[in-house]
Amino acid sequence: MTRFLLIIILGFLLTACQQVTVDEPEFVPHQLTELRVGTLYGPQIYMTSGQGNSGFDYDMALRFAEYLNVPLKMVPYTNRSELYDALKKNDIDIIAAGMTETPARREQFRLGPPLYRVNQVLVYREGVAAPKDISKLKGRITIIADSAFVETLTQLQKHHPSLVWDQVTDKDSEELLAMIANKEIDYTIADSSSVQINRRYLPDLRSGPVLEEKLDVVWLLPPTHSDALMSQLLAFWHQEKLAGTLDHLNEKYFGHVKRFDYIDTRAFLRAIETVLPRYRQLFETHAGDLDWRKLAATSYQESHWNPHARSPTGVRGMMMLTEPTAKEIGITNRLDAEESIRGGAAYLRDMINRLPESIPESQRMWFALASYNIGYAHVEDARKLAESMELNPNAWRDLKKVLPLLQKRKYYQKTRYGYARGSEAVHYVDSIRRYYDTLVWVDNQSKQPMPEDEQNDLIAEELPSMPAGSLSPDQPK
């Protein structure tokens, strides 16, 4: 009996020592028949409008989908927690939402290569004393839960124990900035690029101390089973970096918003409400295949929408046309608003058509406006100068670097048409781009977005104060 029990016990022990195997379901990777991109709404991230989709992350995602030869599916979420969960559950393939690299994100996800850099800044309202010490603020900081700003403040709190803040889950960055402008909250933290873009519509925003500098904005990939997608992303990034796409998009979304004039911005917003309604129909009618808002932005830069504007140099009217230019395009009364707008549109269209075909469609308007300002001949001089300096003569970002050189004897003496105030042309174009951005934002407030299937067929064009009276000067063209 004892021997029998011993045999049974030994049997149990042998069974217990054997390795127990559990059949786990094998991971089946998502077959990439489309690129599912999780994102957040924001002007520099992803926006939908009557003109299609736009945003740095959107433009890059669309190019990545084309690189992979699959359709793009943008999947907006309302907060970061939902985004993170969706990526972990394999509901999306990648997060492209203007997120910076942080220790917490490095621990949870795989991070793609850098797209651009931002600073984290404290944001307050015009009229409030500029804060110098974040631990001695007269008011409270409100930030978004699960954002990189939580990590930043947590680190600062170690050195400033009295530092406290509120976290919200039902707002986004744009809402918090609007709440600052509307005096609903005291302070928030935002990326510098977001502040620069939003103060075109909320001019009372002010940037305070920089809390974190030169943070890389990256895309997030799943922590596991993403080797193939990461390899493809790295190859794509390398290709686009060499092609100048990152520089192009940086110029497109951020190049023209770094300059800011508080008084001018407020005046422009007032003019949109009080003056533009009288002339909007004229801009829409005579713009033709141009975006009427670009035509209106150009007119504001020229005359502040004053049909009786005059300059000592002899230019007049809404579009500040010279007399020779007016005759050339059949305008008899430059002080008549409709005639001036019609003439300005025709002249701008002519400038666009004269440009070489090598200049991409998305850049042609900015080249044309520079031609509008200092003359086509000087723009051609600048393009040739750019080429001699091994810069791209068909990229506005490079022409911006070269145009100011036309004011230096070392350079203009080598050109065909000589001296030109190229730096003013750069400022002129950038100002129009800022006005255009603001008009688009205001116009879109009352419009419904296009259907999603139509939006992805469009790649948004580039968005983008010199003294009035610079339009179509009398010089070689």
From Swiss-Prot:
Its main location: membrane. It holds the Pfam family SLT. Residues 1-22 form the signal peptide. Its EC number is 4.2.2.n1. The active site is at E302. Residues 23-257 are annotated as: Non-LT domain. One of its GO terms (molecular function) is peptidoglycan lytic transglycosylase activity. One of its GO terms (cellular component) is cell outer membrane. It comes from the Bacteria. It catalyses: Exolytic cleavage of the (1->4)-beta-glycosidic linkage between N-acetylmuramic acid (MurNAc) and N-acetylglucosamine (GlcNAc) residues in peptidoglycan, from either the reducing or the non-reducing ends of the peptidoglycan chains, with concomitant formation of a 1,6-anhydrobond in the MurNAc residue. The keyword Membrane applies. Residues 451-460 have a biased composition (Acidic residues). InterPro entries: Lysozyme-like_dom_sf, MltF, Solute-binding_3/MltF_N, Transglycosylase_SLT_dom_1. GO terms for biological process: cell wall macromolecule catabolic process; cell wall organization; peptidoglycan catabolic process. It is found in: Cell outer membrane. Residues 258-477 are annotated as: LT domain. It is a peripheral membrane protein. Murein-degrading enzyme that degrades murein glycan strands and insoluble, high-molecular weight murein sacculi, with the concomitant formation of a 1,6-anhydromuramoyl product. Lytic transglycosylases (LTs) play an integral role in the metabolism of the peptidoglycan (PG) sacculus. Their lytic action creates space within the PG sacculus to allow for its expansion as well as for the insertion of various structures such as secretion systems and flagella. The N-terminal domain does not have lytic activity and probably modulates enzymatic activity. The C-terminal domain is the catalytic active domain. In the N-terminal section; belongs to the bacterial solute-binding protein 3 family. This is Membrane-bound lytic murein transglycosylase F. It comes from Shewanella sp. (strain W3-18-1). The lineage of its organism: Bacteria, Pseudomonadati, Pseudomonadota, Gammaproteobacteria, Alteromonadales. The gene is mltF.
